[in-house]
Swiss-Prot record:
Keyword entries, A-Z: Cell membrane, Glycosidase, Hydrolase, Lipoprotein, Membrane, NAD, Palmitate, Signal
Organism: Phocaeicola vulgatus (strain ATCC 8482 / DSM 1447 / JCM 5826 / CCUG 4940 / NBRC 14291 / NCTC 11154) (Bacteroides vulgatus)
EC number assigned by the record: 3.2.1.-
Keyword Phosphoprotein: no
PANTHER family referenced in this protein's UniProt entry, alphabetically: BCDNA.GH03377, GLYCOSYL HYDROLASE FAMILY 109 PROTEIN
Name listed for the protein in its UniProt record: Glycosyl hydrolase family 109 protein 4
Keyword Cell membrane: yes
Gene3D superfamilies in UniProt: Dihydrodipicolinate Reductase, domain 2, NAD(P)-binding Rossmann-like Domain
Annotated InterPro entries: Gfo/Idh/MocA-like_OxRdtase_N (IPR000683), Gfo/Idh/MocA_oxidrdct_glycsds (IPR050463), Glyco_hydro_109_C (IPR049303), NAD(P)-bd_dom_sf (IPR036291)
Lipid sites, type N-palmitoyl cysteine: 19
Membrane topology of the entry: Lipid-anchor
Subcellular location: Cell membrane
């Protein structure tokens, strides 16, 4: 009898054990990201907001009559940024930093040409640390190699500086979360330098979408398709033994869309991401590496057995509100440059590459304020040139009206770089929220590691982290911020007066040096 009771108790324990919920298995990636399965979807562990820490949605800083800037990274993109800032009133270039002191010194010639005073020079692996400690810098503009974006930004934020970071601004989820937390704790801006949000077609189309020209936009595409075969040798190499350069080596070691922001940024603004909608689920798929693998073998003379980044990567995202985003990445195969930028609305369609055009029916075009000049206008084809020109003229973005002409003169990827820099300075001078915040940065840069996790698990669905921590629906609709005409005029007058005096000083300093 006693034996029977023991057997019954043991059996009951087995049943209870089998029926009790088991803790899900926690997996850890090589980047330290923890995730687990939940009903067939991968859920990445996200940190809670620490007590006392607040969101920076809509963050503003006190107005700055003058924006004092330190530039870090003066290789391929940095010098162009220095040059553009000499054309923006109310800015002062205080310091220049690069690993190679010759590159930093070379940018003094840009200042000389613009009659701007010399800047302080910093160099070496950690030269940026001293730059960030200066008390006469408001903004640190970062255009270094990808792996240095985060440590430089972290140092700048910890030293009380606003930061503007070239793309991709963060290379993994941990860096995304760290920048979110740093911006929230320091109350400093963390701006992603995504220039493609300021290109002409994208800005005008955004304005059309916000005014209902396409109806509800339910699907969007973006991409970075750019054959870099002519550029691989121009990326910085760390000594004679470095045969690949930093960018090719990063592609070799990392799977996923490592350069997603050019394609994702503009369409995320159209879809009001974390301003009424959010990216909810992601899945990614890539081809095998053929060109990338071959490049490494040609440059090293050794077999490459594990080139992680596929020659072409496609990432699909579903939003909370049932929209779909498709983002592509290909820097390997021969084909024309292409960022796709395609919007599918319930009443119209927009497409940038390879042919710019809009497709609207006659009724929708009329409802959008443009009267068709042809009979039987149909959305089966793009608008005729006259109708397209009229639509673009009606919905030309206010920012393009303000900066477009001078941007074409100054340049920088056709002018969009100058518009981006000008808007950054404008918002700082007028104490406004920036066009992109740290949550944009984190969301757009997160595609790389999230896609890698998806593909390393048979292209499984991955839940997208909510970097706003539940506040993605607080703001209704993406909007650019503007000062009142009176405030804008007062700010610009002060900016121009400062720059005029600065150039007088600079011209005297350079003349004195020439006389030595």
């Amino acid at each position: 009898m006693k034996k029977i009771k023991l057997l019954l108790v043991a059996g009951a324990c087995v049943v209870l054990s089998a029926c009790s919920p088991q803790a899900p298995t926690v997996h850890t990636t090589d980047k330290g990201t923890q995730w687990e399965w939940n009903e067939g979807t991968i859920v990445v562990k996200s940190p809670e907001r620490p007590a006392g820490q607040k969101s920076v949605i809509g963050l503003t800083a006190p107005k700055m009559e003058v924006v004092r800037v330190g530039f870090v990274g003066l290789g391929m993109r940095g010098p162009g940024a220095v040059s553009r800032f000499t054309h923006i009133p109310g800015t002062q270039i205080v310091a220049l930093c690069d690993y190679d002191p010759k590159r930093a010194e070379a940018c003094q010639n840009i200042l000389k040409k613009a009659s701007m005073p010399k800047a302080a020079i910093y160099s070496g692996e950690t030269g940026y640390e001293e730059l960030c400690k200066r008390d006469d810098i408001d903004l640190v503009y970062i255009a270094a190699d990808w792996l240095h974006h985060f440590p430089i930004a972290k140092c700048a934020l910890e030293n009380g500086k606003h930061v503007a970071i070239e793309v991709p601004s963060a290379m993994n989820l941990q860096e995304c979360w760290d920048l979110v937390n740093l911006s929230e704790t320091t109350r400093k801006h963390c701006f992603i330098l995504e220039n493609c949000c300021y290109d002409w077609f994208e800005m005008n189309t955004l304005n059309m979408a916000q005014n209902g020209v396409f109806g509800e936009v339910i699907r969007a595409q973006g991409a970075y398709i750019h054959n870099l075969s002519d550029f691989w040798d121009y990326y910085w190499k760390n000594g004679e033994n470095d045969k690949l350069g930093w960018r090719l080596e990063f592609n070799m070691r990392h799977r996923g869309d490592v350069y997603a922001t050019h394609g994702l940024g503009p369409v995320a603004q159209v879809l009001d991401i974390h301003r009424g909608d959010r990216m909810k689920t992601l899945t990614a798929m890539d081809t095998k590496s053929v060109v990338g693998k071959g490049l490494v073998e040609a440059k090293t003379g050794s077999e490459c057995t594990n080139f992680r980044n596929g020659d072409h990567t496609t990432t699909m995202i579903r939003t909370e509100n049932g929209k779909v985003i498709e983002i592509q990445h290909n820097v390997m195969t021969p084909q024309p440059y292409n960022r796709l930028y395609q919007l599918t609305g319930v009443k119209g369609f927009a497409n940038k590459y390879p042919t710019e055009g809009y497709a609207l029916g006659a009724d929708q075009l009329s409802a959008s304020g443009v009267q068709p000049k042809v009979d039987n206008l149909s959305s089966h084809g793009f608008l005729p040139q006259a109708e397209m020109d009229a639509l673009v003229e009606k919905y030309q973005h206010p920012i393009l009206k303000k900066y477009g002409e001078i941007a074409k003169e100054v340049g920088g990827h056709g002018g969009m770089d100058f518009i981006m820099d000008s808007r950054l300075v404008y918002c700082l001078q007028n104490g406004l929220p920036l066009d992109m915040d740290v949550y944009d940065l984190a969301e757009w840069c997160a595609l790389a590691e999230l896609g890698e996790i998806s593909m390393d698990n048979n292209c499984a669905a991955v839940e997208f982290p909510d970097f706003t921590r539940g506040e993605w629906n607080v703001v209704k609709g993406y909007k650019h911020a503007y000062a009142s005409p009176e405030e804008e005029q007062a700010s610009m007058e002060k900016a121009k007066a400062f720059t005029a005096k600065l150039k007088e000083r600079g011209a005297k300093e350079w003349a004195t040096e020439a006389d030595k």
